[in-house]
C-alpha cells in the first residue's frame, strides 16, 4: 500500500522539477554546461531542451500508474549519474569550506541547495525508484507494465 504514495511522490517531484527546467530552458542550459560533462553545442542544446520534458513524461506516467516499473527504472537511471555529478562538483568546490556547507544550483530545478541535503534527497528518490522497480504493487495503476 505504501507504493501508491511513493509512486505519486516520485512522479510529482519529477513533474515539478521538469516543469521548472522546461519553463527556463536557457537557465537550465547554463546549469548543464557548468558540469563540463557534455561537449558540443548541439548535444548540450538537445539535452537542455529534451530532458525536462522527458522528466515530466516519466513523472506523469508514475502518477497515472502507467508503465510504473519502466518509468521508475528510467528515473533511477537519471538520478544515479546526476547524483554522481553533484557529488563530483561538490568535491571540486570543497576547499576551505565544510562539505555540508557547500551550496550551488545543481540544475535540478529547485535553485541553490546545500550539497548534503541534495545528496540525501537524491538517495531517497533512488531508493523509492528501486522499490517501485522491484515491487509488485498494482493498486491504483492503469497499467503497471507495458509488456
Task: Map each language-model feature to its residues.
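Extended, low-polarity transmembrane helix blocks
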Residues: 1-26, 53, 60, 64-147
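Solvent-exposed, well-ordered loop and adjacent helix/strand elements within mature globular domains
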Residues: 17-51
Amino acid at each position: 500500500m505504501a507504493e501508491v504514495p511513493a509512486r505519486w511522490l516520485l512522479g510529482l517531484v519529477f513533474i515539478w522539477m521538469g516543469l521548472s527546467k522546461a519553463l527556463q530552458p536557457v537557465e537550465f542550459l547554463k546549469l548543464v554546461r557548468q558540469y563540463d560533462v557534455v561537449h558540443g553545442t548541439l548535444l548540450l542544446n538537445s539535452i537542455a531542451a529534451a530532458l525536462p520534458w522527458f522528466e515530466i513524461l516519466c513523472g506523469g506516467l508514475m502518477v497515472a500508474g502507467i508503465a510504473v516499473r519502466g518509468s521508475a527504472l528510467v528515473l533511477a537511471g537519471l538520478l544515479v549519474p546526476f547524483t554522481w555529478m553533484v557529488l563530483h562538483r561538490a568535491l571540486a568546490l570543497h576547499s576551505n569550506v565544510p562539505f555540508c556547507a557547500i551550496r550551488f544550483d545543481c540544475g535540478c530545478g529547485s535553485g541553490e541547495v546545500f550539497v548534503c541535503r541534495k545528496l540525501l534527497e537524491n538517495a531517497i528518490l533512488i531508493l523509492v525508484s528501486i522499490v517501485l522497480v522491484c515491487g509488485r504493487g498494482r493498486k491504483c495503476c492503469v497499467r503497471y507494465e507495458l509488456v
